[in-house]
Amino acid sequence: MENGFLLINKEQGKTSFETLFPIKKYFNTNHVGHAGTLDKFASGILIALVGKYTKLAGYFISLDKEYVAEFRFGLETDTLDSNGRIVNKADYIPSVEDIDLKLKDFVGEIYQSPPRFSSIHIDGIRAYKLALNGKFFEIKKRRVNVYDIQRLSYDFSSSSLSLKITCSKGTYIRSIARDLAYSLNSCAYVSNLKRTKIGMFRLKDSTLCKNLSKSSLISLESLSSFKKVYIDSSKVNLVKNGAYVEVQININEFKILKSREGEILAVIEGIGFNKYKYVIIF
């Protein structure tokens, strides 16, 4: 079975799950997952994990993200995107000066309520399923970090604002659109969304599913953030059997264990000072 990860350019109109179908077919395995859902209406980079690399989903999900988004003022949909039903209208369209002033309030550590149409679990049920059934529910605000927001353009005549947003995991761009508009006494939805970066991985280096090849599969050794630890031959079997060997590691740090001959043996994650757990054993 193949093991590795892929940088996929997800197209609009497909769910992240649907995007995996051609990958499963190409590599002839159902052992394929993704790290970080990208909404159906959105496009951009999606990290797909193949084989044992599915166990690294948590690492990839934790990486910071970059988006290019387009907000349209004056209308709000129930989904806060272009696929939703219009539920609110506003005559007031903010000026670019007012927008620039308010954008500053959305940089840094902020609290936001995820959209009602989202994958958040509410008592074990996805929020979007409750919303589709007209159920009343509340979603608690969550703390996220927005590192930078750049205004790329603003067309007052079409009420369209284009932004580049760099943020932490769990940040909802649709919530930023909603909350920014409310702070300006207007309303808005996200008319277009493209994820351009996940951690060090950029959209320009991704591939469309129709262009998949064996060379598209990336190994851990390409990740500079994963330091390598070489294991003496006398301890290789210990690692292969999941036994503890002495390794210097910090909490939340990932390391690759390799044999002196260059064979990748395992991936470990620090859970304390010089304490770790096995994430993958090859």
Swiss-Prot record:
What is the protein name for this chain? tRNA pseudouridine synthase B
Under the heading InterPro entries, the entry gives: PsdUridine_synth_cat_dom_sf, PsdUridine_synth_N, tRNA_psdUridine_synth_TruB
Q: Which domain of life is it from?
A: Bacteria
Function per UniProt: Responsible for synthesis of pseudouridine from uracil-55 in the psi GC loop of transfer RNAs.
- Give a GO biological-process term: tRNA pseudouridine synthesis
UniProt keyword annotation of Isomerase present: yes
Q: Where is the active site?
A: D39
**EC number(s) on file:** 5.4.99.25
Coiled coil feature spans: none
Q: Which gene encodes it?
A: truB
